[in-house]
Amino acid sequence: PFYDCHPRYSALHDIGYPSPDALKAEAEKETEKPLIAREYAHAMGNSMGNFQEYWDVIYADSSIAGAAIWDWVDQGIAKKENGVEYWAYGGDFGDQPNDENFNINGLVDPARKPHPHYYEVQYVYQPLTFKRDTYGKIHIINRDSFTDPSEYDITCDTVTFGSERVLNVYARLKTDKPWAGKGFIVAREQFVLNPYEFPSLPAKKTDGKAQVSIDGNSLTSWIVDGHEVLQGPLEPYFWKPENDNQRAAHFAERTAEWKEVKDVTVNYTIIDDHTILVEMDYLPSTADRPIIPKVGMRMRLPASYTQISYYGRGPWENYPDRKRSAFLGIYDMPLSEYETEYIRPQDNSNRCDVRWFEIGPQSSTLSPRLRIEGFQPLCIRAWDYGEMDLDAAPRHPQDIPRGRFVNLNIDLNIHGVGGIDTWGQRTLPQYTIDGNRPYHYAFMLNFCRPK
């Protein structure tokens, strides 16, 4: 029978949901027709990892004509229950059978508010790219066949953060367009001119008189200026909840043994009554460990700690395989903005390459602020709920109990979000964490007196 989509009758050769390597291999194999990925990069939930890897392949092979993301918008329907309006999906209307949240797979939510991964797509798709050569000269590459770079204002600025100096380059519209106004940033890039100098580990001493309690590898109590600053212990913690991609790939089943940390040693050095140096070592005792969801520690702070300032990648959420659009900078925001509220709750809020991080009460109170400084880049997530609340698989944000504490994860590294499909493909190997090699990291905790 005749099918207009059959390769025999089509002017294009098309495939669906390849990995970047599979896309490259298919393009090399197909020698008679242009290749397109009719659908790729399934944007469901916390997704769109490894997006740059796709376009490294596409730009390197002129026989690849392009690819189409699935999808643009989450197809949720506004619904109100008990005075709370939320985005409903399959099963919220008594419909059986249903596809649950499988239609919640866009770059923007139903109200067209961008998800964090929207900005990664915007960055990778930008028509101009900027390259810096060994002499410091910036080269502009125009990938748009119909728009000359002269239509943009190219500007740059340098920003210094301590020892680190970065150059930001922007291409802005010179005039209003039907789709954006004058000054809209069409393309941007960041170059590190002078890298950040992470501090050296201090000489260890125990002269401080901090009121602390330590149980094994866990710091269980810390009283600062008469206040207990911990609502839950600072402890080694290698588990993380799933996102939609990981749920479909049985991530929790494959990594379940990491709900209990093994082969870890933590050293706490009291510098003074407000400052503690934390060093963690993981040394595997066997060679058959599965990948690790994350390598790091967690703690719980008072629920009043809802104002955040940090120096790292942002301002939006980013993960190791989805961080190119998130530039280094100092960002200030409330906890509610630091979190990402996905329509179906899942792992969220990570920030990569954090140099320092501060969190404390919004108003001026007697409660001290916590400052964290890494001796290497950190990954940090913060929520006003716990991992167990996400592991319980709530259907909607209002199903999560909030306001009991602030949950803070301070990590060396975290598993990437993935971004090929949401029915079994796994995160690319370079964005996973090998459970069979050692890890060491360190950070300083300092509870600053309020000014």
Predicted regions and their residues:
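Conserved, mostly hydrophobic/aromatic
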Residues: 39, 67, 121, 140, ...
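Substrate-binding/catalytic cleft of secreted carbohydrate-active enzymes
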Residues: 1-107
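Terminal connector regions
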Residues: 159-201
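Beta-strand-rich binding/interaction modules
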Residues: 134-173
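Beta-strand/loop-rich accessory regions of lumenal/periplasmic or secreted enzymes
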Residues: 161-163, 192-451
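Short, intrinsically disordered, charge-balanced linker/junction segments flanking boundaries
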Residues: 1-6, 126, 130, 145-160, ...
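Aromatic-rich peripheral "rim/lid" segments of glycoside hydrolase catalytic domains that contact
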Residues: 75-141, 179-197
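Short, hydrophobic/aromatic beta-strand segments
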Residues: 147-154, 181, 288-296
